[in-house]
UniProtKB/Swiss-Prot annotation:
Matching SUPFAM superfamilies: Tetraspanin (SSF48652)
InterPro entries: Tetraspanin/Peripherin (IPR018499), Tetraspanin_animals (IPR000301), Tetraspanin_CS (IPR018503), Tetraspanin_EC2_sf (IPR008952)
Regions that span the bilayer: 12-32, 54-72, 84-110, 228-249
Alphabetized UniProt keyword annotations: Cell membrane, Glycoprotein, Lipoprotein, Membrane, Palmitate, Transmembrane, Transmembrane helix
Source organism: Rattus norvegicus
UniProt key word Transmembrane: yes
Residues anchoring lipid (S-palmitoyl cysteine): C5, C74
Topology feature Cytoplasmic, residues: 1-11, 73-83, 250-266
Protein known as: CD82 antigen
């Protein structure tokens, strides 16, 4: 390998590791977001889905190690440190294997996540209290208000709640209440509301002034959109990792041959 080719390889490897470092930060940030988000469907899933939490911690670990390896790769490439490049290659290969494993698990557990979300939402609805004081009740109120939906499949899911089931007045979940289209300010109401102009003798969902759509389809679209973005980022990182592996091998072989040529021969 000529000196000019080696120089190009060094700086290409440096550039790839810089991108690698940035994408590692994105993966780490995604894992932190899964754990910290309290205002979307993720916050509802966290209460029951251990697989989602495990996946989040894996993303944080992989992202942190990826950033470290990107840093080591930059130093090893610029200074031609063979031991650093070898260490970089080994860890990069392990990261790639772990990353592919997590992606496969997320892909094949998509239906399980959807089922877990449905079970969690129905449990929240059935046990929803008048004060709505728990974190998961507050999270579901936020979801219904933000996405403009009510219940899981439909608003009638709320009839399983004892408070609404036993009410003789037109009582409904406040976070489901319809808002004016021109009102862009998000106001999240909690608990149950009573209709002022109620004339019905029983509490029927048909009489509720709420959004008619359930949240299931919107939740599925949300999951597909966000996990699609995640898989796209991970695929981009995987391509950079493969290029990094190839370039690190080339540079390691060159450094080894250069060191060997400097050994005096008798």
């Amino acid at each position: 390998m000529g000196a000019g080719c080696v120089k190009v390889t060094k700086y290409f490897l440096f550039l790839f590791n810089l991108l690698f470092f940035i994408l590692g930060a994105v993966i780490l940030g995604f894992g932190v977001w899964i754990l910290a988000d309290k205002s979307s469907f993720i916050s509802v899933l966290q209460t029951s889905s251990s697989s989602l939490q495990v996946g989040a911690y894996v993303f944080i670990g992989v992202g942190a190690i990826t950033m470290l390896m990107g840093f080591l790769g930059c130093i090893g490439a610029v200074n031609e440190v063979r031991c650093l490049l070898g260490l970089y290659f080994v860890f990069l290969l392990l990261i790639l294997i772990a990353q592919v494993t997590v992606e496969v698990l997320f892909y094949f557990n998509a239906n399980k996540l959807k089922q877990e979300m449905g079970n969690t939402v129905m449990d929240i609805i059935q046990n929803y209290s008048v004060n709505a004081s728990s974190s998961r009740e507050e999270a579901w109120d936020y979801v219904q208000a933000q996405v403009k939906c009510c219940g899981w499949v439909s608003p009638s899911n709320w009839t399983r709640n004892p408070v609404l089931k036993n009410s003789t007045k037109t009582t409904y979940p406040c976070s489901c209440e319809k808002t004016k289209e021109e009102d862009n300010q998000l106001i999240v109401k909690k608990g149950f509301c009573e209709s002022d102009n109620s004339t019905a003798s029983e509490n029927s969902p048909e009489d509720w002034p709420v959004h008619p759509e359930g949240c299931m389809e919107k939740a599925q679209a949300w999951l597909q959109e966000n996990f699609g973005i995640l898989l796209g980022v991970c695929a981009g990182v995987a391509v950079i990792e493969l290029l990094g592996l190839f370039l690190s091998i080339c540079l390691c072989r060159y450094i080894h041959s250069e060191d060997y040529s400097k050994v005096p021969k008798y």
